[in-house]
Amino acid sequence: MNQSALILTHFDKKSEYDAQYIDNQNIDLKSLFERISENKLAQTFVSSSTTPKLSLQNIKRGVRYIKAAGGLVRNAQGDYLFIKRLGKWDLPKGKVEDQERMKEAAVREVEEECGLKIKRLGAKIQSTYHVYSMHGEVVLKKTNWYAMDVDGCPPLVPQQEEDITEAVWLPVHQLSIVRENTYPLILDLIAGLDAEQ
């Protein structure tokens, strides 16, 4: 939400975060999104609950909910795949189709968006949530991210109809290029890659 974060947690240590605290019974994602959109400043909101998963279920009921899947893809040289979509560095991902499993969607989307063939689908890295407005409607998108590998260093073909203008392989020591122009959720996903150097 405009680089802001809503943290649903199970503990109640208000000193842990420099944040605004929200009663978990009164989280209205639409209203919160409008407030953040008007303010334009990145903010952190925290809601503490003994049942954060139940709080998430309640939030999902009030907005359009989309499932997506994507990948953090590594080639045989140890370089990672990044795409530039709408002027920002990102990872390939896309919407899960009806009757499609998350893992299947992740592989399909990466292959479609970058014109390559995934050799191995690894473990789920994590799930992220992203809120945005589409056609005047507030959308909550959950994305499952998976580790993936390809043979060799295949050429990349960015899917331009998905607003992807570049697809590149980057070694870990060049990830500062991505960090300077990406989203906070992508920063979280690639945070552990520095240990590979």
Tell me the role of every PLM-derived stretch.
Residues 16-22, 74-112:
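Conserved Nudix-box catalytic region and its N-terminal flanking loop in Nudix hydrolases
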Residues 70, 79, 166:
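Conserved beta-strand and immediately adjacent loop positions that scaffold enzyme active sites
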Residues 64-69, 86, 141-143:
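Short connector loops at helix/strand junctions that flank enzyme active sites
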Residues 26-70:
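Acidic, metal-coordinating catalytic segment for phosphate/diphosphate chemistry
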Residues 1-3, 10-18, 155-197:
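Nudix hydrolase/Nudix homology domain
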Residues 96-183:
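Unchanged
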Residues 73-74, 147:
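Conserved hydrophobic "DFG−1" position in protein kinase catalytic cores
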Residues 1-38:
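N-terminal leader/capping segments at the start of a protein or of a new domain
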